[in-house]
Regions:
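Generic signal for short, ordered secondary-structure residues
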Residues: 11, 77-78, 104, 169, ...
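Active-site beta->alpha N-cap acidic-glycine motif
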Residues: 52-150, 154-157, 161, 172
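A general, composition-driven signal for non-globular sequence regions
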Residues: 3-7, 24, 129, 133, ...
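Compositionally biased, intrinsically disordered low-complexity segments enriched
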Residues: 46-47, 136-137, 234
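N-terminal pre-catalytic segment of deacetylase/amide-hydrolase enzymes
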Residues: 2-81, 88-101, 123, 247-267
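Hydrophobic alpha-helical membrane segments, chiefly transmembrane helices and signal peptide h-regions
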Residues: 18-33, 131, 198, 223, ...
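Catalytic domains of cell-wall/extracellular-matrix polysaccharide-remodeling enzymes
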Residues: 94, 116-117, 139-257, 263-267
Length: 267
């Protein structure tokens, strides 16, 4: 989950694996908790400054619910493939190639400055029929502890950069908080700007490079948690991710599981 931005890239490399592991554990807990009780954790953390006392039961005028999406538009049996922390000039093209080979559409959760730095990749993602998701400006996994104004800038500045990079009027359709650090406010801001808050149910833990087999096994073991699977195309060497994604897509086909996009307008 840890996104290493520009100037700090070298200084924190040694600690990145440990931090990524901790984030992955937290993320899994978060995903399962959310599956059982949607929105509860975020409501407890942020109730004092929430402007939405219903804790996400609301829906914005354009019909985008504030609640975190876990379902698939492609039906109950479908799986949503989501790809985080890119785009990355080395690994995003490899991920795109695997998806194309399997004729699978995925949702790419991009970090604003990465999109700005690699607009050609954003355009490729859109041209291949995938969907865009806002993964903030700085991938601050503690943003849920910060001001609403800060959260708003993290979300809306990234949306602007991603859409500028995409061009052709392409829209960012989802918002995923880094490390699952959603708040009622951030969900409201996202929904008000046409972006459905998007969670995950299966963390493949690919970020920590546990080996291709471990990444594949995580999907097989945890797909019963829910339909949305988390992979990464950013944050370092993603060779295991590319291989594991290829195997997972073979396995899903064998299992008769279609793939699709996360729900946007249904609760
Ligand atoms: Zn991330």
């Amino acid at each position: 989950m840890r996104f290493m931005a520009g100037e700090s890239k070298q200084g924190i490399r040694a600690g990145a694996v440990v931090m990524a592991s901790a984030a992955a554990v937290a993320a899994t807990v978060w995903g399962v908790a959310t599956l059982v009780e949607p929105g509860k954790a975020a409501t407890q953390q942020n109730v004092s400054r929430s402007t939405d006392p219903a804790g996400g039961a609301g829906s914005q005028p354009q019909g985008i619910p504030e609640g975190i999406a876990h379902g698939s538009e492609a039906g109950e049996n479908a799986v949503n493939i989501t790809i985080d922390d890119g785009p990355d000039p080395r690994w995003t093209p490899k991920v795109l190639e695997v998806l194309q080979r399997h004729d699978v559409k995925a949702t790419f959760c991009m970090v604003g400055p990465q999109a700005k730095a690699h607009p050609g990749l954003v355009k490729k993602v859109v041209a291949a029929g995938h969907r865009l998701c806002d993964h903030t400006m700085d991938h601050d996994t503690a943003m849920d502890k910060k001001s609403v104004a800060y959260q708003e800038r993290q979300i809306l500045d990234a949306k602007e950069l991603i859409e500028e990079a995409a061009g052709s009027g392409a829209k960012v359709e989802y918002y995923r908080a880094p490390g699952g650090a959603f708040t009622p406010d951030s969900r409201r801001i996202a929904a008000a700007h046409g972006m459905r808050p998007l969670g995950w149910n299966v963390d493949t833990k690919d970020f920590g490079k546990p080996g291709t087999a471990a990444v594949v096994d995580a999907v097989k073991r945890e797909i019963g948690n829910g339909p949305t699977v988390l992979f990464h195309d950013g944050g370092g060497n993603r060779a295991q991710t590319v291989d594991a994604l290829d195997q997972v897509l073979d396995w899903l086909k064998e299992q008769g599981r279609p793939t699709g996009f996360p729900v946007r307008t249904t609760p």
